């Protein structure tokens, strides 16, 4: 083995999805019909968590997670502690608007994974159906919420350090193979 694993360095995960505003708050703000848009996340909470995790000698940091089966965030759903490396993922990490620009400043290496739109649409519809939407509702959500968000994300790709493109001939395969994963 090579890379971080071989050096005994382990990575913690802080997923942006854990910072979805609750459905009750989204209802109160009138944003639930756009859940997943940049302003439906607690960006300030996300930034504060990144700051806590990145601090030298950081103790255990409890980070929220997202449960798709519940369609809700779960407070303190994961523990991130003195790992030395923190992996974070999310759609809006390269955006320059509404606080997201500060997220980019906290990320040492930002990678955008580029997926052809037709593949993205199929994956999103399948995911929505898997978690309870009927095919018509899933397609509507993808067209009216997810695709506009994806197009917004595409406007900020220039702020990423790298762009990984999924092979055209293997649209359902992942972008990281076993050899690449061993180097992480």
Q: Where do the model's predicted regions map?
A:
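Conserved beta-strand scaffold positions in the cores of enzyme catalytic domains, especially
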Residues: 13, 110-112, 163
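Conserved nucleotide-sensing/catalytic segment adjacent to the nucleotide-binding pocket
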Residues: 12-15, 21-67
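A conserved segment at the C-terminal end of the G1
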Residues: 1-8
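Alpha-helical scaffold elements adjacent to nucleotide-binding pockets in ATP/GTP-utilizing enzyme cores
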Residues: 45, 49, 120-127, 141
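Short glycine-/polar-rich loops that comprise or flank the Walker A/P-loop
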Residues: 9, 105-109, 157-161
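The start of beta-strands in P-loop NTPase/AAA+ ATPase cores
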Residues: 10-12, 84
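Small-molecule kinase domains that catalyze NTP-dependent phosphoryl transfer to phosphate-bearing small molecules
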Residues: 98-101, 126-177, 184
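ATP-dependent NMP and nucleoside kinases share a basic, alpha-helical "lid"
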Residues: 70-127
């Amino acid at each position: 083995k090579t890379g971080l694993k071989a050096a005994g360095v382990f990575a913690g995960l802080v997923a942006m999805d854990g910072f979805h505003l609750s459905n009750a708050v989204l209802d109160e703000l009138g944003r639930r019909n756009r859940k997943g848009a940049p302003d439906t996340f607690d960006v300030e909470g996300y930034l504060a968590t990144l700051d806590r995790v990145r601090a030298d000698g950081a103790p255990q940091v409890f980070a929220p997670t997202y449960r798709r089966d519940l369609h809700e965030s779960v407070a303190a759903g994961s523990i991130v502690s003195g790992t030395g490396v923190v992996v974070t993922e999310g759609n809006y990490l390269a955006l320059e608007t509404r606080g997201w620009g500060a997220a980019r400043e906290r990320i040492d290496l930002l990678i955008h994974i580029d997926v052809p739109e037709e593949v993205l649409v199929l994956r999103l519809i399948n995911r929505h159906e898997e978690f309870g939407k009927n095919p018509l509702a899933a397609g509507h959500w993808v067209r009216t919420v997810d695709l506009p968000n994806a197009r917004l994300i595409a406007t900020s790709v220039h702020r990423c350090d790298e762009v990984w493109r999924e092979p055209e001939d293997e649209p359902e395969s992942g972008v990281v193979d076993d050899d690449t994963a061993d180097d992480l």
